[in-house]
């Protein structure tokens, strides 16, 4: 497998003379090629150490792909059709040997990563369709369902360790603090939930926000919690101040359907308009765009183990890869320049505004001509 997340050594020019002139050298791309599925993927996860990407689609099928920047080397390793309905989430275990999946069919599956064999099935894990999944450690996991139910599981035991229903709507996303003590839940009822999974008790619900909370992430070294919403607003909470928001700001997006942290200050959001936005937290700025799904809603985002690639799934049935190198060099300051209203978002990758992989390299010269600069005026809106 091509070490995609490692820099390739420079080739000796003398070796090139020994190559058969009739053989073209394999093309090395900035990112792996798009993966085309037969149905949109609603679950997406990178392997913790290897160049593998798992996807679960709305037909209930689960796939594992080996990806590479060498053209023609990205390929499917195996697929599984054990779920009866849509696969909602996929997560690799910490050691990368297992893949856990959950589904609208209310089941939890544990698969062997090497062969794709089903090792364990919990058929009726919830009384309602399961919508979200989070692994706590190699044995413990948390699931959330469409009616607001949350269950804590130990794979070495039968039945859930904890079963709570404090939310009134579906559990959209979950996050865990570094100590693996507090579970944070984003729900369709507009509330952020806090659960102590060490003591197996409910702590509190935040005040309801406008619209569904669709995603949750810890930022600023755990000092802030960011929640995306169906109204296109990011809500910020102080750690240990979960009752009410400390800040908020609206993106020029119909919704925020998914969200993934890239650094402690930067995150990426996927929206119904198909645009993947890079957002800085405090100061709150929309830095630019790293890519798009050509007007099709973005369903899920995931960051590779090396941090170089962002993967996205959309309703166009494609899995796309985006280069995060340029985004990581962006510096955001507190000074605000006036930005032309309605202007295009800054492109943060060579194919950010391309609708086809064929055009991936056409913007490279333009982007390279721009020296790295401090971004200070890319916000769509002021924070309250």
From Swiss-Prot:
Keywords: Cytoplasm, Nucleus, Phosphoprotein, Repeat, rRNA processing, WD repeat. Residues 1-33, 362-384 are annotated as: Disordered. The lineage of its organism: Eukaryota, Metazoa, Chordata, Craniata, Vertebrata. It comes from the Eukaryota. The modification Phosphoserine is found at residues 354, 383. GO terms for cellular component: cytoplasm; nucleolus. Signal peptide: none annotated. WD repeats lie at residues 36-75, 82-121, 125-163, 166-205, 208-247, 250-289, 293-332. Coiled coil: none annotated. It is found in: Nucleus, Nucleolus; Cytoplasm. Residues 9-19, 375-384 have a biased composition (Acidic residues). It holds the Pfam family WDR55. One of its GO terms (biological process) is rRNA processing. Nucleolar protein that acts as a modulator of rRNA synthesis. Plays a central role during organogenesis. It comes from Rattus norvegicus. The keyword Ribosomal protein does not apply. SUPFAM superfamilies: WD40 repeat-like. This is WD repeat-containing protein 55. Its main location: nucleus. Belongs to the WD repeat WDR55 family.
């Amino acid at each position: 497998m091509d070490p995609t997340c490692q820099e390739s050594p420079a080739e000796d020019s003398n070796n090139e003379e020994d190559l058969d002139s009739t053989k073209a050298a394999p093309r090395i791309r900035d990112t792996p090629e798009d993966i085309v599925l037969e149905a949109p993927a609603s679950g997406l996860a990178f392997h913790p150490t290897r160049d593998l990407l798992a996807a679960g689609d709305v037909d209930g099928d689960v796939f594992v792909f080996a990806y590479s920047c060498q053209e023609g080397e990205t390929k499917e390793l195996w697929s599984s059709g054990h779920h009866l309905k849509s696969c909602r989430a996929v997560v690799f275990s910490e050691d990368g040997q297992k893949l856990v999946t959950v589904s609208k069919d209310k089941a939890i599956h544990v698969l062997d990563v090497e062969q794709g064999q089903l090792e364990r099935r919990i058929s009726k894990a919830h009384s309602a369709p399961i919508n979200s999944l989070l692994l706590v450690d190699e044995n413990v996991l948390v699931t959330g369902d469409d009616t607001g139910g949350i269950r804590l599981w130990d794979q070495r035991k039968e039945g859930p360790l904890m079963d709570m229903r404090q939310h009134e709507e579906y559990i959209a996303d979950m996050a865990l603090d570094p100590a693996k003590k507090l579970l944070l839940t984003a729900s369709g009822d507009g509330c952020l939930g806090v659960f102590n999974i060490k003591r197996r008790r409910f702590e509190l619900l935040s005040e309801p926000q406008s619209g569904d909370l669709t995603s949750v992430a810890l930022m600023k070294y755990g000092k802030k919690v960011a929640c995306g919403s169906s109204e296109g607003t990011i809500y910020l909470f102080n750690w240990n101040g979960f009752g009410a928001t400390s800040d908020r700001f609206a993106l020029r997006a119909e919704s925020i359907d998914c969200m993934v942290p890239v650094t402690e200050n930067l995150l990426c959001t996927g929206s119904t308009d198909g645009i993947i936005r890079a957002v800085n937290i405090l100061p709150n700025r929309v830095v630019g765009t790293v890519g798009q799904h050509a007007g099709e809603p973005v369903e899920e985002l995931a960051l590779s183990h090396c941090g170089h690639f962002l993967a996205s799934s959309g309703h166009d049935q494609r899995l796309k890869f985006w280069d995060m190198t340029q985004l990581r060099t962006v510096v955001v300051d507190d000074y605000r320049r006036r930005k032309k209203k309605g202007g295009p978002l800054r492109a943060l990758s060579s194919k950010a505004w391309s609708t086809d992989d064929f055009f991936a390299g056409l913007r490279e010269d333009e982007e390279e001509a721009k020296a790295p600069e401090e971004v200070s005026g890319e916000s769509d809106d002021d924070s309250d």
